[in-house]
Structures are given as C-alpha cells and as structure tokens.
Curated annotation (Swiss-Prot), chains A, B, C, D:
Name the UniProt record assigns to this protein: N-acetyl-gamma-glutamyl-phosphate reductase
Taxonomic source organism: Crocosphaera subtropica (strain ATCC 51142 / BH68) (Cyanothece sp. (strain ATCC 51142))
Alphabetized UniProt keyword annotations: Amino-acid biosynthesis, Arginine biosynthesis, Cytoplasm, NADP, Oxidoreductase
Gene designation: argC
Major place of residence: cytoplasm
Coiled-coil region(s): none
Catalytic activity: N-acetyl-L-glutamate 5-semialdehyde + phosphate + NADP(+) = N-acetyl-L-glutamyl 5-phosphate + NADPH + H(+)
Enzyme nomenclature, EC number: 1.2.1.38
GO biological process: L-arginine biosynthetic process
Listed GO MF terms: N-acetyl-gamma-glutamyl-phosphate reductase activity; NAD binding; NADP+ binding
Subcellular localization: Cytoplasm
Length: 352, 352, 352, 352
C-alpha cells in the first residue's frame, strides 16, 4: 500500500496520557499521518517540550482546538479530553465529515440521562450521541465498521466486560451475583498533578476508592444489560495499585449450572473470542499478570470454577492505557477503515 | 516495673521475615529479654550477618534448634518456622513448661483432619493441638489469657476476619454470599528466594494466585463458622501487590436486612471493637490505605453499603508482618502475661 | 520525670512531610506536648482531615500562623515552611523568648549574601541570623546546647557531610577532588503536587536534576570549608530514586596519603563519631542500604579505598525525612534541652 | 525483501532475561527466523511454560545445547549464557561456519589475562578470542561489519562508554579524573532467584555494590584506553535502583580546557554520533530519565559543564536489557548482515 493512501489524523488533548499513547501508536502506524495535535493549556508548546523523549520522533507543536482547522486538515480525529468537552467538539467535526473517536465518557451512553446523572452535565447533542457506537470491538465489531463516531470504553469497563461477556451472553451466570473487584495502576488517574497520585503517597500502598459509586458502574451495566437481554446490576469496586500501568479485574459470579467446570468455560470463551486477535485465553490453572499485557493491546483471561461455592472467577488483565484506552481506539480505527484489525498495534510486551 | 521482672524469650526461625519482626519488636519491648535465637540453615551465623542493619542492636548468634536448651533458658518461645515443623517442637517445649506462640499454620485448626487435608501432613500431637488457642485477640481475648499454646492466625485470615466478624457474629449477612478479595505485599511470601518474588518479576505487575484453593480458606471458614454458629463457606482470592508490606481485604456480602445503612454498621463495628485498642474504624466514606498500617499493629476498617445491590463492602488494612504476624503474636503474649495489651506495639506509622 | 516537666511545642507548616514527621516523632516524645499546629493553606482543617491515619492519635486543628499566639503557648517552635518564610517568623518568636528550630534553608548560612544569591531573597534579619547554629549535632553539638535558633541542615547536606567530615577535618583528602553523587527518594520533593513527582512519571525511572547548580551545594561547601579551615568547592549532583524515603550519598575524593587503607579509615571514622549515637559505621566491605535507615534517625556509613586510583569512596545512607529533616531537628531539641540525645528517636527500622 | 531471504537464528540461554529479550526482538525482526532455542536447566520445557505471556507468539521448545545440531540449523547463533560457558561453545560453532554473538563477558577482552584475572577462568580458545570484535557499534561499526564473532558489551560499559567516548577520543579530559557513578535496575542481576533481588528486599531501597572491584571496570578501561591511545584507569561504582529496567551512568571528569562550555560539547557529541541512529543528545539543560529509553535501543545523553569546578558531567540513560544487552546484539547482527542498522529495533518507548 502506497504512501499516498495514508490518512490524516488529528489528536486533540495530546498532552495527556491518552494523547501520548495515541501519538506513540499512530507515529508507527503504517497507514496514518499525524497532522494535528490540539490542546487547551498546552497550545503553543512543541511536543518535545511536553514529552522530551519523543523529541527525535515527533516534530509538531500543540495547536489551539479549532474545529474548522481540524476538519480541514484531518479525516479522522481522536479526542482525548476530560469528560464533558467532547460533546461540544464532536458534533461540528462530524458535520464537516470527520470520523471521530472519543476517549472520554461523553459518547459511551445510549441513555443520556444516565450520563447526565453520573457525570453532572446536561447534554444537547442527542442526535449526534444516537449515532455513536460503543468502541469495544470484541462485542461491537460490526457496528464499528460503519460508524462515524466511536465512544471508546473506559479502562475498567474494558477489562471487566472482556471477562464477563461470554458469561452474560450465554446466560451462564446469575447476573445479580456479579462482583467486579478491579485494580488499576495510577496512570489511570491521568497526568494532572494530584496529591494522592504522588509517588510519595501512592508507592507502597494499596486502597479502594469510589466504592459503590464509581462512574464506570453504569457503563458496565449498560453493556452487560445489552448482552444479557435484560437489566443487570453489578457490584464494582476499583482500587489503586502502586504501579504505573495495568488493570486486573477479578470477576465473581454464581453459575446457573453448578455442573460447569473450568474446561467447559475455556471452550466457551475460546469460541466466543475466536475472531478476536487480541484476546488470549490462558490454559488450565494459569492466571494473568498485568505486566504480560503492558505495552500491548492484548487482554489476557484466566478462568477458574469453584465447586465448593458454585462460582466462576474470571481474571482479566490489560494495559489500561492501550487496550483500555488508546490502543482500543486505534483498533476501532482499523476496523472503521477496513484495515487489518491488528495494524500498528503491539502484541508482544517487553518482559520483565 | 523492675528489670528483674522481665521474661526470657526465645525466637526459633529467627532468620525469616516473621523472625526479624519479632526480634525488632521484642528488642524494644520493656518486659522481654531475647535470650535465644534458633534456626536450622542459619545456625552458627551472627544475627548481624543475616541482618546487618541490626548489628548495632542485637548481639546474638543463631543456635541450633535444641528443645532441651530452649526450655532451660526461655519462659516463652515464639516459633517462626515453615508449616509442619512446629508440631514436632511445641509438644516437648510445652511439656517442659514453656509457653509457646506458633506463627505457622500448625496450631490454627481445631480439626486436624482439615489441617492434614490442606497441608498434606499427618499429625500425632492431637493432645497438644487440643489445647491451642487461635491467637486473634479481638475474638478470643479471654481464651488467650489462660493459654499455654497459641496458634497465631495467618495474615490473610487476620485482615479478613477483622472485616467479617461483626457481620457474622450479629447475623447481619447471608454468609454464603461472602466474597473476600484479598491483596498482599510480597513479603508475605517470605525471605526464601523464589523467581516470582524477584523485584524484576513482581514489580509493576499484579495478579491472583491460589484461586479457589488457597490454604487460608479453611482457616477463615473455621473461625467464620465459629462466629456464625453454623458452617460457613467463603470465596477467598489472594493477589500479589507490587510492594513490600501490607494487606487489603475487600469483603463483600449481601445484607440480610437491606435497610441497614453505613451509619448503622459503623455503630455496630464500633461497639464490637470497643475494647480493641488496635482496631481503627474510619469515619463515613473513608477507606483505608495499607500504608497507614505499615510498621504498626493496627487494623483500619472502612465500611460501605450499596443500596443498589443490598450489599455491604468492608475494607480492612493491616501490615501483614505485624498485625498479620509478629505483632499479633506479641499482642497475644501481652495478654497471656497479664500486661497492657499494647505494650511494645507501635501504633503510629511513618507516613509517607 | 513528671508530666509537669513536659515542654509545650508548636509546629508551623504541619501539613507538609516535614510537619507530619515532627508530629509523628513528637507525639511519642516523652517530654514534649504538641500544643500548636500552624499552617497557611491548611488553617482550619483538623489534622485528621489532612492525615486520616493519625486521626486516632492527634486531636488538633491547624491554626493560622499568629506569632503572638504561638509565643504565648509554646516554649519551642519548629518551622517547617517553604524557604523564605521562616526569616519573617523566627525573629518575633525569638524576641518573645521561644526557642526556634527552622527546617528551611533560611538559617543555614553564616553569609547571608550566599543565601540571597542562591535563594533569590533579600534578607533584613541579619542580627537574628547571626545567632543561628547549624543543626548538625555530630559536628556542632556544643554550639547547639546553648542556641536559641537552629538552622536545620538540608537532607542532602546531612548525608553528604556525615560522609565527608572526618576526611576534611583530618585533612586526609585533596578537597578539590570531592565529588558527591547523591540520590534521594521522591518525598524530598515535598507534598505539593508536581507532575514530575507523580507515581506515573517517577516510578520505574531514575534521573539527575539540578546538575552543577543545586542549592545544597553552597550549604555543603560552607560546612566543608569550616571543617577544612579553608575554602572548599565540591561537585554535587542529586538524582531522584523511584522510592519514597531515603538518601544515599556516594562520596569520592583522592587521598592525600595513598597508603591509607580501609581499615585505617574505619578506625578514624569510629573515633570521629565515638560520641554520636546515631552514626553506625559498617564493618569491612559492607555498604549501606537506604532501607536500613528508614523510619530511624540513623546514618549508616560504608567506607572503601581503591588502591588502583588512590581514592576513598564513602557511602552514607539516611532517612531523608528523619535524620535528613525532622528527626535531626528533634535531636537538636534534645541537646538544647539538656536531655538524652536519643530521646524519642527511633533506632530500629522495620525491615523489610 | 522476500520471505526466502530470512536467516535462521538460534538463541542459546533462552530462558534468562537476555534470552527473552532476544526472542522478543527477533520474533518481530523482518529478516530473522528463530529456529533453535537452547538451554541447560530448561531443556525440554516449552517456551510458553517459562514465559506464559509469549505462549501465543512463540511455539518452540528449549533444546539441549548441541553444537552439532545448532550449526546444522542456524546461520547465526546468539549466546546468552553465564560467563565462562561461551568460550567452550563458540569455537565449534564458528568452525562450522556460524556467526556468533555472545552476550557474556567471554569475548569482550583483547587480553585474556585480564579476563582470567577478573573472571577466575583459564582459557584455551586464544585463536578464537583474537577474532572477536567488541560489539559497540557506535565505536566499532566497521570492524563489526566483517566479524564472525562478537563479544557484546556489558550493560554498564555500554552506558558509560557512550558518555565517555567523545571526551576520550578527542582528548578533552584528564582521563585519570574520570569517575563513573552508575545505577541499574535489578533485572541486570538476571532471573536466578537471589535473596537480595527479591522485591521485599530491593524495593524501597538503594545501595552500592562491588565498590572499587566490579568486573565491568577492566572492560570500560580496555575500551577507554583504546580510545585515548594510552592506558586509562577509571573509578566505577555500580548501584541497584529499586526498579526493573534501565541504567543511568553519571560520568564526571575534569576538562583539559576549562574554557569549554556545554554548547561546545553538545556540538562535539553531535558530530561524534552523527551516524549513530540510536544516540539521542538532549538539548541544553535537559537530563535523561531512564524510563525514556525503556523498551528501546536508544541511548539518551545529557551534558553539563561546571565552570566552578572545571568539570564536565555527562548523563547516559539506556535500557539495560536492550541497548545494554539484547538490542545491541541485534544492532550488531544488522550491521554484520549488511542490513539497515535500525531494523527490528524499537525507538519509541511507552511512556509513562
């Protein structure tokens, strides 16, 4: 495929962790040219000033967010802004013919009332929002193919739904028994300086936050309900791990049929994810380490049943900034453009 | 109290992490003299050779494990050996009049068949085992007072039972819904060199192990059943955190009475632990960080209810090597000797 | 000694890391009552709101910085404020009869022009500054005894001067060959949220900063010159270690007499620090780990000579927040009050 | 270039960290097929048993080390064995026509007596050793082109020599003033379980080792002497950083001409490394973070002069397992084969 077939891409919110992952991945993507880096506070800075390690590879300056200019230069736009901003920027971009992939929560919800009640923001872009597709390719690959607007999933929902989906879709569990105990590296908190994310505070410590009220709960429930065909409520508890990258979700649910054993579930999961190149189901008795997924777009799944309690326990590991964010967005881009789904997406971590 | 009233104490298995915590704590305990350090592989080494940072404080050499010699010199003996060794050493020591506090699993079980089936070791010390008291002072303070043999709890059971006990004792939850998602620093794996505990392997990673089959499960179930008054089964999943010290247990259960709210439970927990100086119940909406407990014998508890799911979620943080091991043993010693329960036990961490 | 003999102490700047160490140490000091916590941004907050883990131990509220009120209630005042503020607060406190221990750089310099040129602040408190004593007890114990104002040393200078002093004092090295390659945990950067101190940025990374221009250079040189009896210039390079606490200084210098061997220097160092209870000189061939000093007021020194190059290499490890800051201030207090130098100061770390 | 032009490669010592980096890099190298994984203790295991995260990518079993079989199947062989083994394996492989790249110390020394005295091993392969080229492409690119046997540099020497070479080659410093204060992540210690490399021991700590006697000293001196044209002695001190990957070398030396300023040296370094695609010289006042190099074959250099002391300070950051080991070996392979030097070698890290 020739140089001329590359598409022009803009990244808005390029100075954050989502942004720098997108820059990193798209810089090496064979069919993409990054032509616009946009930001608010960082406008005017060269990218090398913000991320000196990329000085040799990226020779761009952050520009102000000007939808007119963006649309005139970009075929595809990634939005990596804080929640509540994309819903103002995406509509004009779409109207001007851009494809938009939004990494915030703004376009993840079918029901904007759910969004508004959890994110404290009223919305007037209902028509645009209706066209958005939830960007989890393993579940919505077909819809993504023809979408113009992708609401990329949150990091916790990605890890959790990868673990839960086969169980819900096939009706194998009692949905109301679902408990998701999730743990994330601190990069999930973003690059803004917050005291509790300082190394001096977070290193050598582990704790929960947002117990019974984290905003990823309704997102997980929306997709879970879609898969189950009826409303599902889950218990979701996030924790911070003293490390940079990675999420592990430990998912518990009671099996509808206590006769199911691990081997059965391995078969079911393998079938469910047969066409999903980034899902790696671990053999009998192996559980994933988050580090195995670091720097890749992979999701590792480990599955266990407990005959003493009739429960299934699924362990799901991803890199929160790649499969949980920027990599998944690129995966969606590949699908939207009709390219190989794995194009430009790493599958081998650097271990250790 | 005069110098002459100090008791003479031996620590067997002094070269491991349990051992060095005991040495550290007892070295500063006002009523204890360490007179015997025993070990197998390390016999003949000075303590400063094993732990150079203590060279200025501890001038003792590890001696072979000779029960005759130990009993002749020690009134109290702490055993910090691998599982399956204490059951050979404790009986002669007790027969010779020593009080024994065992940090291994050997004397935690009322039912030795349970022990044998989970620890693959047959036992012939039934008479001795029958006299052992489970060394969790917050639950068995009275029994500990008059005990000669203490089976000190495991680190995970300590954290988990502190969270669960008020709920089970008062019949507030449906016991079979109990899920314990526990996380520990790697020092819980001991000081023996194992590949998966290398910094290069464990740092920057998080994963589960022993899913549905960890040996702390029957221990938690034994005490839970005792508290509930009937057999209780729990789901217990341990994980390794990339840090040295600390355990967080996240405990989930369905409330029998969905009308109970957080404030009710805070009241119930405060009453339950009223006479327990090491338990700190956090006010509304605060959840513990493991680091707060590091270097102390404290257990911090945070409590939440979820009206959406009728569940209670309790978060319990301890230092796995102190409240989860050596500190708790010293707490038991204090109670056995009729001393102030907090004697020689730190209550203020060095933060950050 | 009776309760009535306790002194009343205030801590200004109590919300920072220096402050919380002082609170932690003085809370357990047998002859001190903390009666005033002062702060600027944090005034009005309870201490438990800032540091929840101390909620059970410290029942005080941060008050505004009012020198009148402070002096009326406190015999001794610790100042833990950013550089450039103590020089406005100390003079009125001293005038009203308080003893003052300042943890900032304001009173470390004999020559205020040196201070002004490195800290960009003009000073008008020359008379007060002249009375200040540099609070490194191992070098200035006699002067500290009768001082009313202590300029507590910086963390890097403490570690570095402990390593260098015997060499300079005895004229054993060529001073101009001195190179100090120092490394610190990130808590040295304080509790204010700065991007480069986020766990996500600092974890898993190591780098230098302030090369050839760090403000601790003139401080080290002032004391080095005082010891050598002539002006000394040193090369000082600080680095950030991905961990919370601890400093290691690696100090290099060319020996004046190449015939000196390690054993000679061990003897010289032992004699030099004979009356210094917190200095621990490691035997032949042992080098300190920063973790050995964590949570203690100790300084571990390891010494090596290289006959191939005629250099001496000294390794010095401290806890930057204790011996490098708050603990050293308490050590000075003990000396000023005529108490045992080690009172209330921990000497045993929790290892691992 | 067609599939048929790929070369067949063997990796001996594939289970260690050097081995797994080679597997990782060569698996994605467009002109290489891995056809043989060899090992001693690990022979018979599948690679997925040793490194489960690679189960989906590498379908090979470790075979015994049989030079006959290796030579019959491989054109190029990488040796990643402990020191002292390659010197028995390389000669027969070379005799049978293989090109050999050895990651151990065995072929780094021109003078085998130096090797023998530092590595305690007598050698009988003098003829083979004479043909070996030191595999630091930035210095010996021409010699590597035609070599059959490469002695790949140690990790510390790589970082240190990248910093030192322009200074030595151009005679800009007084060589005897050179001090190299080097710091490494713990993966440099390999995958064998050693107590001091446990996370519980190494995390949260920093210390020196091998002071004045580390085996990388003669290696650095050999190349330094070669560059300077006369014998050079350096002071080299390694330290362990509590992190997995990365080396920072802080190099000090006195300038021959004190008039030289940073800008001069930036110009000189840029010229020296003009044809070296992996060397990135940072602009004025920027110093490298090791994390910038992680997962890449890059070496970042930061340069400072100190007019107060007439010294130059150079900071050099690499990934110890890539540019410091496996990546550099692949870089040599590319040069030996006449391929693009950067082929298959990552240049963009995943930050943070």
């Amino acid at each position: 495929m020739g140089e001329s077939e590359k598409i022009s891409v803009g990244i808005i919110g390029a100075s954050g962790y989502g942004g720098v992952q997108l820059v990193r991945l798209l810089q090496e993507h064979p069919l993409v040219d990054i032509v616009y880096l946009g930001g608010k506070g960082s406008a005017g800075q060269t990218y090398a000033e913000i991320y000196p390690h990329l000085g040799h590879a990226v020779d761009l300056t952050i520009e102000p967010i000007d939808t007119e200019a963006i649309a005139s230069r970009c075929q595809v736009v990634f939005l990596g802004l804080p929640n509540g901003l994309a819903c103002d920027i995406a509509p004009p971009l779409i109207a001007k013919g851009c494809k938009v992939l939004d990494l915030s929560a703004d376009y993840r919800f079918k029901n904007l009332e759910t969004y508004s009640s959890w994110y404290n923001k009223d919305r007037s872009d209902l028509d645009t929002a209706k066209t958005a597709v939830y960007g989890l390719p393993e579940l919505y690959r077909e819809e993504i193919k023809s979408a113009s607007l992708i609401g990329c999933p949150g990091c916790y929902p990605t890890a959790s739904l990868m673990a839960l989906s086969p169980l819900l879709k096939q009706g194998l569990i009692l949905p109301e028994t679902t408990i998701i105990d999730a743990k994330s590296g601190t990069s999930g908190g973003g690059r803004q300086a917050k005291t509790h994310l300082l190394l001096a505070e977070a290193e050598g410590s582990f704790g929960a936050y947002g117990v019974a009220k984290h905003r990823h709960t309704p997102e997980i429930e929306q997709i879970s309900s879609d898969l189950a065909g009826h409303e599902v409520k889950v218990q979701f508890t996030p924790h911070l791990i003293p490390m940079v990258r990675g999420i592990l979700s430990t998912v518990y649910a009671t099996l509808r049929d206590p006769g199911l054993v691990r081997e059965d579930l391995l078969t079911i999961y393998s079938a469910f994810y047969r066409s999903s190149p980034f899902v790696k189901i671990l053999p009998n008795g192996l559980y994933p380490q988050t580090k195995w997924a670091c720097g890749t777009n992979l999701c590792y799944l480990g599955i266990e049943t407990d005959p003493r309690t009739d429960r299934v326990i699924v362990l799901s590991a991803i890199d929160n900034l790649i499969k949980g964010q920027a990599g998944q967005a690129v995966q969606c881009l590949n699908i939207m453009m009709g390219w190989e789904e794995t194009l430009g997406l790493p599958q081998l971590c650097f271990y250790p």
